Amino acid sequence: MAAAPPYVPLAWEEVPCPFCGSDDPSLYERFGSALQYTYVLCRRCRLVYSSPRPRYDAHFVEAAYASYYQLADTVALGPDTLVRESSVPMFREEVAHLVQFDARRSAVLDVGSGMGTFLFAAKPLYEEAVGLDVSPRMAAVVEAQLGVRVHLDRFEDFVHPRKFSLIHMSHVLEHVPDPNRWLRKAASLLDDGGILAVNVPNKFSAGARVQHLAYRLRLKRQFQRGWSDPARTPDHLFEPTLPSMRFLLARNGYEILDHHSYSRRDPASRRTPLARLVHRGLKVGSNLAFVARPRRAG
């Protein structure tokens, strides 16, 4: 297979902090095959974000998600298509944890439903399961094998006749240019007492901190692994951190019911005393999980 051509942005744009709107960041690190991209650190909310970044337009989106569309185009219907065995237990554990906060269990929406693994785990516990994705092929696979409706739409424009008691977003928020708008949209789609579950990478994890220190001491050329490929794009528009996520949720009227870091082997971070210390006490794992509910007026 021929290598993908190098990605060259049509234009660049400087942006304020996507979480708080502040425009007074400090340099955090440079990355990319030629260190052509820049992460800055917001002094106000502590979000790490890309600026200047390639202009967020159709050209960037097509390049950023080319590999996902390529995967979707090659998916074939079959008994083993839907889920990878390694990920089924993880999502089942996550769903079992989330339903503790969702007494109603009426309808669930998975934003960025992909291969449908989360919906596969959640469907038996909910009256209705709905997916939202950008790939028609992937949506067709999930609909055919799970019998759930997968909508092809932007989340900002998505409408549904029924409110949801759970909205799930796993590792999609960091790809979104306006995360505040997404959280407000989620609140409008949630039933009274409904919950939002958000999973994101943790830029301030212990591992990330150590590698960033090595970068600052010039012991490592750049933080990201795999950035030697010039075709790669900075598809993460920002890298969430614990303080910035707390800020974002509070700013948009959410009450945090539970939050912790996690590993794929233990999504609820409760299996061992060490896991509880690292992920629920210190919260320094490589991923962050939040369960939140819109605050009631009055």
Predicted segments — roles?
Residues 245:
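Short active-site alpha-helical segment characteristic of glycosyltransferases
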